[in-house]
Amino acid sequence: MSNILTEICATKAEFVAERKKQIGNNALLDLIKAQTQPRGFRAALEKKRARGQFGLIAEIKKASPSKGLIRSDFTPAAHARDYEEGGAACLSVLTDRPYFQGHEDYLIAARQAVKLPVLRKDFMIDPWQVTEARAIGADAILIIVAALDDQQMQDIEAAALEYGIDALVEVHSHDEMERALKLKSRLIGVNNRDLRDFSVSFDRTYELVGSAPKDCTFVAESGIRNHDDLVAMQRHDIGCFLVGETLMRQDDLRKATKDLLGLS
């Protein structure tokens, strides 16, 4: 695990411990009962693919540890509508507070504004967070293989399955891919960015995808800049993408999404 990831997970453990004291499990279960049914995150991506279209997960992201503030005029509901109108298949919303200036309320606002499925983008280290994710309406959660041991991954995935939501399992290496494939989820995120030096390489992604079973839905993450990148990846059987910063820095999110997807 990289130093920054170790630090983030340690901070997250403290944060989750405090959240558990503030919000009882029964309160979360009551909120889940009031939620609408999960919208089918992986299914939405596959539906786009079946139509010969790109499956875009458009990310609502205010800031990052490495880049600082990304967007000052930050309105999650409006951004969600722009992404939906631009042709995105799904949304991803950052809810991590200390490092990404995210918040659970951002996911709630975004999901209420659209009909798209929404991923809770956060550092999941405890099944309790999955319960909270469903309570605020998330249709999918993120499992970062580099941050967890096998038992932790299984426990978090089991919670997601219990609530009927998808798990996007993120990998960065062959070893992590092997561990990810021990899980039931076949929604695999391949990060183009090397966490050791933050370099971006699509070649690593192509290699990882080429070595994995064909029953997986692969999502390329990080470093995607334009439509040409999507076309290049499609040649390697990658048709789903998670894009955040590239879009969030644009003035017109709707147009930027269309341009990225080649729909302009």
Curated annotation (Swiss-Prot):
The record's PROSITE patterns line, in alphabetical order, gives: IGPS (PS00614)
Q: Name one Pfam family in it.
A: IGPS
Query: Pathway, per Swiss-Prot/TrEMBL?
Result: Amino-acid biosynthesis; L-tryptophan biosynthesis; L-tryptophan from chorismate: step 4/5
Q: What's the catalysed reaction? A: 1-(2-carboxyphenylamino)-1-deoxy-D-ribulose 5-phosphate + H(+) = (1S,2R)-1-C-(indol-3-yl)glycerol 3-phosphate + CO2 + H2O
Q: Name one GO biological process term.
A: L-tryptophan biosynthetic process
The GO terms describing molecular function are:
indole-3-glycerol-phosphate synthase activity; phosphoribosylanthranilate isomerase activity
Tell me the superkingdom of the source.
Bacteria
Task: Write down the EC number.
Answer: 4.1.1.48
Looking up HAMAP family in the UniProt record yields: IGPS_B
The family annotation for this protein states: Belongs to the TrpC family.
Protein name in the entry = Indole-3-glycerol phosphate synthase
Species assigned in the record: Zymomonas mobilis subsp. mobilis (strain ATCC 31821 / ZM4 / CP4)
